């Protein structure tokens, strides 16, 4: 037995209440035995001002804070293992989440888009109903490929995506961006590359996986049920046009110089942000379009 008095005016103190209730139960069920160290069954009693709550064992849930109590954020959902786990981690800290995905047809397929929608649907079990914003990213991505130094392509693309994500976030009154980056996991996630991507826009970027290794991230992915969907073999836009030897320690000066040589990029980003497809994600809906 465990007792708690939310109503301190109740005449019996918690230990006394436990003794009385325990004696009552043993009187009704004499085959029971008391084991305070390793009980097979715990009964909880909570005294309130207008009654009492009685319940059995606690069932562990996700924990954390109620969704929505810490603000609103936009999660960059690529379709891989990391970004769904990042969304889950931040939802546990009370953020109300929406997702943004960058699609580059014909280089990326409809199946890749369906995969991301399925991931958003699986995450809705933890985050609640949300919106999935699908950005038509083909033209900005081709423009960067055709006009920028090959070794800087990945960081320039990440900066472009963050600028578009900020435009979408501002339109929907979201206060931060979320990414699934883990320090030094790939070339675009070194300290220098992250510093360059951070400088692209001014919304806070939350990176809950930054200190985790892949084994830890995969374990969470399996736990929340997104792993099997994440490993489906449909290519997303982050893996196309990838240079064989990207620069791992770019400087902000050379990144900004490369962007100065792409005067048409800002307009392409604006158009992409204004033509996003908005897909409502509801708990219990069909994962297919």
Role assignments for model-derived ranges:
Residues 1-74, 84-130, 139, 199, ...:
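RNA-binding accessory domains that recognize and position tRNA/RNA substrates
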Residues 20-25, 31, 58-70, 137, ...:
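Active-site adenylate/phosphate-handling loop in enzymes that bind or generate adenylated species
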Residues 55-57, 100-102, 135-138, 179-180, ...:
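Generic beta-strand/beta-sheet core signal
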Residues 80:
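Conserved G/P- and acidic residue-centered "switch" motifs that form tight phosphate/ATP-binding loops
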Residues 185, 233-241:
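Small/polar glycine-rich anion-binding or flexible loop at a beta-alpha turn
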Residues 225-233:
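A short alpha-helix-loop-beta-strand transition element characteristic
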Residues 259-260, 264:
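Trafficking entry modules
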């Amino acid at each position: 037995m465990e007792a708690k008095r939310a109503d301190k005016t109740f005449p019996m103190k918690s230990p006394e209440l436990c003794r009385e209730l325990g004696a009552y139960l043993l009187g009704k069920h004499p085959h029971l035995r008391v084991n305070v160290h390793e009980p097979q069954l715990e009964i909880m009693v909570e005294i309130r001002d207008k009654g009492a709550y009685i319940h059995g064992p606690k069932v562990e849930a996700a924990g954390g804070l109620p969704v929505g109590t810490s603000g609103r954020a936009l999660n960059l959902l690529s379709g891989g293992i990391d970004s769904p786990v990042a969304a889950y981690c931040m939802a546990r800290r009370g953020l109300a989440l929406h997702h943004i995905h960058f699609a580059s047809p014909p280089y990326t397929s409809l199946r890749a888009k369906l995969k991301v929608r399925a991931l958003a649907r699986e995450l809705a079990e933890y985050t609640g109903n949300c919106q999935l914003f699908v950005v038509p990213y083909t033209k900005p991505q081709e423009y960067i490929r055709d006009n920028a130094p090959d070794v800087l392509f990945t960081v320039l693309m990440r900066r472009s995506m963050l600028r578009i994500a900020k435009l979408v976030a501002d339109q929907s009154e979201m206060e931060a961006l979320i990414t699934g980056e883990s320090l030094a996991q790939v070339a675009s996630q070194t300290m220098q590359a992250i510093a360059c991507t951070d400088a692209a826009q001014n919304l806070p970027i939350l990176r809950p996986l930054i200190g985790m290794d892949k084994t830890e991230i995969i374990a969470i992915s399996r736990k929340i049920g997104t792993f099997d969907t994440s490993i489906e073999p449909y290519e997303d836009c982050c893996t196309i046009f990838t240079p064989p030897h990207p620069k791992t320690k770019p400087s902000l000066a050379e990144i900004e110089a490369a962007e100065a040589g792409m005067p048409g990029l800002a307009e392409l980003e604006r158009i992409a942000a204004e033509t996003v497809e908005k897909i409502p994600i509801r708990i219990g809906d069909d994962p297919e379009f």
